[in-house]
């Protein structure tokens, strides 16, 4: 099994991007990290790639959404992460998609791709095919 885990704010930019990728059609499960802090926590027990937006308005110290931090602070969830894909806003210069490299470093996984806001058609294609190839070429245990 393989999965994509994503977080999307109320803007739904990341959610729409993930929907356009149509991961289930290539055999990849999709799980959303809850937006509301009082929601039941998400527990993932299969290899996954995480897709995250960047927060903080250019402040890299606030780049990773708190909900994502909480999810990854669970050792059982962190055990299954295999890569990270980040979105961001190029208006923030050096902090563009900064959540990706932060998670990549802390979890010792590759930063696989970055895209702006909701992504383009080309981004959707690249991510969908990249995720499909990654899980078909990489042992999942």
From Swiss-Prot:
It comes from the Bacteria. One of its GO terms (molecular function) is FMN binding. InterPro entries: Flavoprotein-like_sf, RNR_Ib_NrdI_bac, RNR_NrdI. This is Protein NrdI. It comes from Bifidobacterium animalis subsp. lactis (strain AD011). PANTHER family: PROTEIN NRDI. Probably involved in ribonucleotide reductase function. GO terms for biological process: protein modification process. NCBIfam families: nrdI. Belongs to the NrdI family. The gene is nrdI. Signal peptide: none annotated. Pfam families: Flavodoxin_NdrI (PF07972).
């Amino acid at each position: 099994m393989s999965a994509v885990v994503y977080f999307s704010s109320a803007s739904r930019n990341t959610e729409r991007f993930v929907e356009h990728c149509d991961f289930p059609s290539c055999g990849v499960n999709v799980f959303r990290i809850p937006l509301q802090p009082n929601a039941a926590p998400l527990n993932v027990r299969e290899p996954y790639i995480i897709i995250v937006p960047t927060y903080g308005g250019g402040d890299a110290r606030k780049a990773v959404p708190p909900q994502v931090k909480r999810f990854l602070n669970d050792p059982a969830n962190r055990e299954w992460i295999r890569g990270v894909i980040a979105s961001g806003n190029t208006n923030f210069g050096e902090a563009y998609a900064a959540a990706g490299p932060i998670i990549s470093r802390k979890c010792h996984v590759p930063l696989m791709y970055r895209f702006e806001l909701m992504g383009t058609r080309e981004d959707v294609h690249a991510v969908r095919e990249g995720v499909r190839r990654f899980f078909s070429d990489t042992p999942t245990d």
